């Protein structure tokens, strides 16, 4: 590596488990050369990058610092820009009013030429400022509400044991652990530790070898599969919604799909011809239309752009039901989760109160 001066990295964290992500970050932090990185992994950008280059509407803008610093500077820039636009518009209105008053009074003194020049200058400035303002994208709108609340105890693992044939270690080994109403749990561990398997056990897709999972009455589970297997890929987005809600008015369906950024052409395109991100939005919409008070989310931010991730995070923060999520998106885990379940790979589950950053601090990895 001593001969390499620069790395060009295109989505380097895709498909990596958390231990490998941590190794990559340590390696890149020690690398003495330059790095040009394209990534949607906000946590990774926060830990590695010293400058952020934003591309928006065909324009680029640079920000010094990591991803958090970029967010802060961008917010300040947009607020300052909005203030300058407002001030400029008020000055144009003032000058226009003054010129109109002078015209009505037939009072053409020496200042009229100066005022015309000031008005022209302010109009040019306003035009320039508005060019700096990013075009507002139609935001993705989630509206997630739980059904009637479940009991305080949502579910319990009792002596839960599972081992796969050919694997020399258990996935679960006599696990005793519970989930409470309103908890938002992030499940982390190396690939193969059983993260997704845990969700599938709760969803009764996989049976335990021993023990039970006691799901309390009134618990309604919604499951987001990372491969979107609950969708019918031969259907269009409209047909997928009609299948779930046959009595919903067509106009309401179109309006709802519009809120999820589906155009007129896209709503009549079979899902198999849509992108991964577009299918992910349909899978999330399907989940929102179902009546549930517990969500099992398997890599819910895969294929979503940053705006969609932020919309999803805000929605899940306000969701009053229970959430259990498997995700390699550490920024997402920070924003949504209040508890981390760590699967070390020995059949146990270690509970860490707090979000992912709290978990790292306890592990001495922050």
What role is predicted for each listed range?
Residues 76-170:
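Flexible nucleotide-interacting loop at or near the entrance of a catalytic core
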Residues 1-85, 149-366:
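ABC ATP-binding cassette signature C-motif
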């Amino acid at each position: 590596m001593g001969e390499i001066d620069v790395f060009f990295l295109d989505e380097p964290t895709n498909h990596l488990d958390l231990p490998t992500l941590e190794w990559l970050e340590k390696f890149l932090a020690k690398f003495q050369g330059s790095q040009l990185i394209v990534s949607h992994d906000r946590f990774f950008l926060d830990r590695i990058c010293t400058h952020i280059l934003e591309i928006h509407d065909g324009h680029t803008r640079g920000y010094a610092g990591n991803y958090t610093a970029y967010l802060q500077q961008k917010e300040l820039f947009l607020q300052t820009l909005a203030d300058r636009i407002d001030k400029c518009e008020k000055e144009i209105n003032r000058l226009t009013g003054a010129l109109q008053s002078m015209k009505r009074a037939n009072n053409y003194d020496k200042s009229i030429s100066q005022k015309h020049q000031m008005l022209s200058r302010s109009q040019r400035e306003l035009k320039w400022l508005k060019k700096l303002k990013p075009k507002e994208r139609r935001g993705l709108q989630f509206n997630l509400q739980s059904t009637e609340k479940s009991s305080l105890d949502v579910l319990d693992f009792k002596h839960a044991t599972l081992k796969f044939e050919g694997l020399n270690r258990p996935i679960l080994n006599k696990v005793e652990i519970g989930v409470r109403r309103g908890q938002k749990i992030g499940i982390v561990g190396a690939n193969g530790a059983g993260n997704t398997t845990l969700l599938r056990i709760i969803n009764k897709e996989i049976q335990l070898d021993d023990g039970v999972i006691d799901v309390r009455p009134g618990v309604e589970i919604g499951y987001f599969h990372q491969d979107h297997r609950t969708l019918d890929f031969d259907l269009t987005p409209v047909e997928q919604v009609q299948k779930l809600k046959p009595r919903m008015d067509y106009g309401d369906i179109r309006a709802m799909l519009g809120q999820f950024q589906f155009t007129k052409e896209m709503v009549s395109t079979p899902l198999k011809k849509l992108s991964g991100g577009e299918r992910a939005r349909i899978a999330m919409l399907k989940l929102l239309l179902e009546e549930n008070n517990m969500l099992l989310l398997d890599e819910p931010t895969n294929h979503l752009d940053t705006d969609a991730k932020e919309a999803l995070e805000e929605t899940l923060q306000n969701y009053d039901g229970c959430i259990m999520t498997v995700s390699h998106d550490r920024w997402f885990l920070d924003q949504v989760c209040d508890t981390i379940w760590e699967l070390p790979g020995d059949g146990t589950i270690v509970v860490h109160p707090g979000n992912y950053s709290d978990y790292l601090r306890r592990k001495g990895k922050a």
